[in-house]
Design a protein with these regions (language model features):
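PLP-dependent amino-acid enzyme catalytic core
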Residues: 1-128
């Protein structure tokens, strides 16, 4: 997967190159040069996966310069009961017919940002 700047710099970079870089040199954000397509069959299969398994399946489409086993391990260490207090990681509860709420504050800081920041910290540790 190659990434380019949102501000027009066409220099292509890989995930591990941009991970620690932050903003692109032209001040833009990085975005995939092209987005992968996911079939309905694949999405139906994904619906049966745990949070960590689903995260792996999605992230491997965007991160191809970390070996699959390493990426699976990083994700497996990130999304755990020990970190998020539940095996569901982000439990969804039905409030009433047609109305659901998803808990995104089960992480260490009790904020939704834990969903990304716990993974980002483990990715930094891997790359450094």
């Amino acid at each position: 997967m190659r990434y380019i700047s949102t501000r027009g710099d066409k220099t292509e970079r890989r995930f591990c190159e941009i991970l620690l870089e932050g903003l692109a040199p032209d001040g833009g954000l990085y975005m995939p040069k092209a987005y992968p397509r996911v079939s309905g069959i694949t999405m139906a299969r994904w619906a049966t996966l745990s949070y960590a398994e689903l995260a792996y399946e999605i992230l491997r489409l965007y991160i191809d310069d970390i070996p699959a086993d390493d990426l699976r391990d990083i994700i497996g260490r990130t999304y755990t009961r020990d970190v998020f207090g539940t095996d569901e990681i982000t439990p969804v509860r039905q409030i009433e017919e047609g109305l659901y709420v998803q808990a995104l504050s089960n992480g260490p800081t009790l904020a939704f940002k834990d969903m990304a920041m716990q993974l980002l910290g483990n990715l930094f540790e891997y790359e450094l």
